[in-house]
Amino acid sequence: MKKILKRILLVLLVLVLLAVCGFAAFYFSRIRTIQSLEKVTDYEDYNLYRMDVQYSYDLDRLISYGISSNQDMLDAILKESIPLLPIHMTAPNYGCSAFSIADSDQEILMGRNYDFKIDTSSLLVHCTPKDGYESVAFAALSNISANQPDASLSKKLAVLTAPFICLDGMNEKGVSIAVLTLDSEPTVQQTGKQTIFTTLAIRLVLDRAATTQEAVDLLNSYDMFATSGRDYHFYITDASGDGRVVEYDCDDPARPLVATPIR
């Protein structure tokens, strides 16, 4: 009887060790991502952090989960960034203004501000996707309840969602994009295309668009679901200075995408 119990315990121990090793191997690149987290400023409450995203993500897989509500959006983000672990996240809110100018050397500069009603730390997110363009983007850490992302394990895990909650960014081709809020009814397109949500649009453009026109075409190939009960538009510009305001026509029930060149 004792021999049988020992064998059972041994088998259970082996299974536990295999599970632990498998989990560690699966999360290795995510652990490295967390280890890259660095505090850039040193203020008392809210700070700037940076992080290198070293795990592979699949935007097409994320989209395939199906998005028709804020909860669908959150579930899709968590499935792609932190599978198997329970992490709390709230749908983000946005405000803001954006602009672009040409400097004295005719280089194109793009800027934006945040009109947040609450204070937040910011995370500079550096992504080098295998099949996409390198980019830097900013995420508001208050949106994932992680204003001090190095304070606990749960907050460190929460920052793994950062690639999919950025509010603006620029890629290696010079394409810049920012999301800005509107007071109109939230866009919920239902034309039969796959659906993306507000901040996923930013990640798609940064990873896959080399020009403003490519960004517009990319966004037009999906239905849009505006998150958090708000409506939004995007400001997109590229290295040539081609700037467009991309919005979804409030005067048409189908909410078709409209891209207006800046003057």
Model regions and ranges:
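N-terminal secretory signal peptides that target proteins for export/translocation
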Residues: M1-K3
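N-terminal mature-domain region immediately after signal-peptide cleavage
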Residues: L5-A210, M224-F225
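Short, well-structured alpha-helical segments that form the helix of a local strand-helix-strand
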Residues: T212-D223
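Extended amphipathic alpha-helical segments with heptad-repeat/coiled-coil character used for oligomerization
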Residues: G229-R263
